[in-house]
Amino acid sequence: MKKLLSLVIIVVGIIADQVFKNWVVANIQLGDTKKIWPDVLSLTYIKNDGAAWSSFSGQQWFFLVLTPIVLIVALWFLWKKMGQNWYFAGLTLIIAGALGNFIDRVRQGFVVDMFQTEFMDFPIFNIADILLSVGFVVLFIAILTDKETK
């Protein structure tokens, strides 16, 4: 049952990410901004050929090699730790986010980013980035609370 739940979460995460990215591309000009919540959140369409803070900009080969490795390792750990809820949640979200951005990189050579925080200076990000970030936080909690690793 957990395998099916993991698959559903991954598929829903990827679909949400891809549908929203396509909506942004169709409705916002590259570089333009639409205010969503004044002084809090805007949608700004950018093409990101790197990672957060534009690190590794222009290094698509790096992501095209690294992402499948991360996915294989995450899937292996997910299989091994399926019964542990924190690992299950974290790894499932990481896989969904990694696949969401990987699809963009393979299809377009860049990732579509759109969420811009207005209240602090932070890189523009997308749904896949949210899934990855939350997944890594949850995985970190899993590792810290895992009795086997202590």
UniProtKB/Swiss-Prot annotation:
GO terms for molecular function: aspartic-type endopeptidase activity. The keyword Nucleus does not apply. Pathway: Protein modification; lipoprotein biosynthesis (signal peptide cleavage). One of its GO terms (biological process) is proteolysis. Keywords: Aspartyl protease, Cell membrane, Hydrolase, Membrane, Protease, Transmembrane, Transmembrane helix. It is found in: Cell membrane. The active site is at D113, D129. The keyword Nucleus does not apply. Its EC number is 3.4.23.36. It is a multi-pass membrane protein. It catalyses: Release of signal peptides from bacterial membrane prolipoproteins. Hydrolyzes -Xaa-Yaa-Zaa-|-(S,diacylglyceryl)Cys-, in which Xaa is hydrophobic (preferably Leu), and Yaa (Ala or Ser) and Zaa (Gly or Ala) have small, neutral side chains. One of its GO terms (cellular component) is plasma membrane. Pfam families: Peptidase_A8. The chain crosses the membrane at residues 5-25, 59-79, 83-103, 124-144. Belongs to the peptidase A8 family. This protein specifically catalyzes the removal of signal peptides from prolipoproteins. This is Lipoprotein signal peptidase. It comes from Lactococcus lactis subsp. cremoris (strain MG1363). The gene is lspA.
